[in-house]
A protein has these predicted regions:
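Gly/Ser-rich oxyanion-binding loop with an adjacent helix/lid
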Residues: 1-92
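C-terminal nucleotide
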Residues: 76-196
Length: 196
C-alpha cells in the first residue's frame, strides 16, 4: 500500500519548535490509521518517529520532542526507563497564562554538530563515572568527581552535566507548579532553564 498526502502547518520550520517531530508523528499517525487500525499508542509512534529523525534524517536527538508531539497537551515524562517512559498528563490550570510561540526568524537546520556535541559531551562525563548515560550516575558522585573530571573533559562538558542534573530537578518543580496553578513558580523554573 501507499498514500498520497498534502500537508499544511503553522509550526515554524527549523526554528527549534519540533517541526520535524510534528511531521514524523503525522506520518506515523497516518500509517497507524491506514495500516494498523489505530492500534499504536503514542509512545510507539514517538519511537518510530525518533528512529526516522535519528537514522533517516541523521539528527542526534532524544525521544522528548516526538513523545511530546505524539502525546499532545501537557505531560510530565520521565525517561529513566527509555524503553517505556513514565507519562503523566497534566491539566494546564492557568486561566491567565498561554503558551505562545514566536517566529524569531532563527534557523537551527545547520546546527546538527552542535546538538550532537551536547549528548557526546554528557556521555563522556558518564563514561568516566562508569556509566553510558548520566541518568545512571548519582548527582552526589558527579559533584564529588568534578576535580577529577576537569582533568579529563572540557569545562563545557562539566557545565552540561550540571545542567542535566539541575534540569531534571527543575522539571519536577515545573510539573508541581502546573498542578498547583502556580504561575510564579512555573515561570521561575522556565526562566531558570533558559538561563542554564
Amino acid at each position: 500500500g501507499g498514500f498520497t498526502a498534502t500537508t499544511s502547518s503553522d509550526v515554524f520550520k527549523g526554528a527549534g519548535v519540533s517541526s520535524s517531530a510534528c511531521f514524523e508523528v503525522l506520518i506515523a499517525e497516518i500509517l497507524n490509521i491506514l495500516y494498523n487500525g489505530s492500534k499504536l499508542d503514542a509512545i510507539t509512534k514517538a519511537k518510530a518517529s525518533h528512529y526516522a529523525e535519528s537514522v533517516f534524517f541523521g539528527k542526534p536527538c532524544g525521544l522528548l520532542d516526538q513523545s511530546a508531539i505524539a502525546l499532545g497537551g501537557v505531560s510530565y515524562i520521565d525517561f529513566k526507563n527509555t524503553k517505556m517512559p513514565k507519562v503523566e498528563s497534566i491539566d494546564w490550570n492557568f486561566d491567565d497564562m498561554d503558551i505562545v510561540l514566536t517566529n524569531t526568524g532563527g534557523d537551527h537546520a545547520n546546527l546538527t554538530d552542535h546538538y550532537a556535541a551536547i549528548r557526546r559531551e554528557m556521555e563522556e562525563v558518564a563514561v568516566i563515572l562508569g556509566h553510558k548515560t548520566l541518568r545512571k550516575v548519582s548527582e552526589e558522585k558527579f559533584y564529588a568527581s568534578i576535580p577529577a573530571l576537569s582533568e579529563k573533559v572540557s569545562g563545557r562538558a562539566i557545565l552540561r552535566a550540571m545542567h542535566f542534573f539541575n534540569e531534571n530537578k527543575r522539571v519536577v518543580k515545573e510539573a508541581q507548579a502546573i498542578r498547583k496553578a502556580s504561575g510564579k513558580k512555573f515561570t521561575e523554573c522556565i526562566n531558570g532553564s533558559g538561563d542554564s
